[in-house]
Amino acid sequence: MINLRGVKMFDKLEEVVARYDELNKMLVSPEVLADSKKMIECNKAINEITEIVEKYKEYKKYVDDIEFIKESFKTEKDSDMKEMLNEELKEAEEKLPKLEEELKILLLPKDKNDDKNVIVEIRGGAGGDEAALFAADLFRMYSRYAERKKWKIEIIEKQDGELNGLKEIAFTIIGLGAYSRLKFESGVHRVQRVPKTEASGRIHTSTATVAVLPEVEDIQEVTVDPKDLKIDTYRSGGAGGQHVNMTDSAVRITHLPTGIVVQCQDERSQLKNREKAMKHLLTKLYEMEQEKQRSEVESERRLQVGTGDRAEKIRTYNFPDGRITDHRIKLTVHQLEAFLDGDIDEMIDALITFHQAELLSASEQ
C-alpha cells in the first residue's frame, strides 16, 4: 500500500471519512429520528461530504490495485500476463494524479452562499440608448440561461429605456446553486457593434454593469433597525394602458445610514412590493459586509477572478467578429448569438475552474 500518512491532504480526507461514518450512525439514532430538524441537518451534512468520500474510496481502490499488480508482477512468469499487468499498472497510475487534483478541489472551503438564490442588478452604462439596449440583451441572456436550468425569475424593479432598452433592472433568480453559477458575472460588460441607428456603419462601444448578489434567505443574517428605514409609497409607473396601477402600491425603501435605495412596483399589492423591496435591501446590506470580507481575502491572495469588483471590465461582446472575450481568464468563445441566448455554460465552467486553480495555488503557498 502506498504510504499516505503524514500527507496533510490525506489526513484531512481520513477526517472527512470519520465524520461521514459518524453522521450515518447519528442518522439512525433514536435522538435524531425523533427530531425532524436534526434529521434534515444530518442529511444535509452527509450530502455535503458524500462526493468527497466516494472520490476518496475510488482513489484508495486504485492505490490498492497498484500494490496488487506490483506484487503479482514479482511472481508472474508468463510474458503475456506480465505485459497485461504492465498495461493495467500504467492505466491505474495514470488515474491517480487526476483523482488527487479532484480531491484537492473537493476539499477547498465551500462558499456558504453557493446554494442560494441570487438577485441580479443590470444597469446601462456608457453609451446612452445603445447601453440600454445592451442591458436588455444581458437580461435576456440571463433569463434564457435560467430557463435552461429550470430556474424561476421574479422582477423586482425595472426602468425602461428607449428602443426597448433597459436603463436598469433588478430581478431574483430562484434555483438551487444559482449563486455558484452566476457569481463571477459581476462587473462591467462591454459591447462593440454597429447601432441600428448608425447610418455610417461605425462601430460603437457601450457598457452595462452587472451585480450578482446572494439573496438573503434568513432575516437573521442581517440586522436592521426600523428607525434606519424611510419607507415611501407611490403610484406605479409604466407605459400606460389598462395595466397602470391607480393605487399607491409601489414601495421605495431608503436605508438612511448607507443611503441605499431600493424600490419595487412589479406587484399589484403594496404588501408584496414591500416584501420584495425589503428582501432586496437586506441582500444589498449583506453583500456590503461580504464584499468587505472578500476584499480583505482577495487582496491578500491577489485573486484574478473575484466576485465583488463591479468596476472591473470583465468581458467584451464583439458583434462584428462574433466573439466574446473574458479578460480575467483570457478566454475567447465564438457563436455570439447562442451565447446571448443563454448558452453560457462553457464560459461559466472555465471561470469556476480558473478560480479553483487560484484557490489551490493560494492554499499551497
From Swiss-Prot:
Keywords: Cytoplasm, Methylation, Protein biosynthesis. GO terms for cellular component: cytoplasm. It comes from the Bacteria. Methylated by PrmC. Methylation increases the termination efficiency of RF1. Belongs to the prokaryotic/mitochondrial release factor family. Gene3D superfamilies: 3.30.160.20, 3.30.70.1660, 6.10.140.1950. The keyword Magnesium does not apply. PROSITE patterns: RF_PROK_I. This is Peptide chain release factor 1. GO terms for molecular function: translation release factor activity, codon specific. Peptide chain release factor 1 directs the termination of translation in response to the peptide chain termination codons UAG and UAA. It is found in: Cytoplasm. Pfam families: PCRF, RF-1. The modification N5-methylglutamine is found at Q242. The keyword Transferase does not apply. HAMAP family: Rel_fac_1. The gene is prfA.
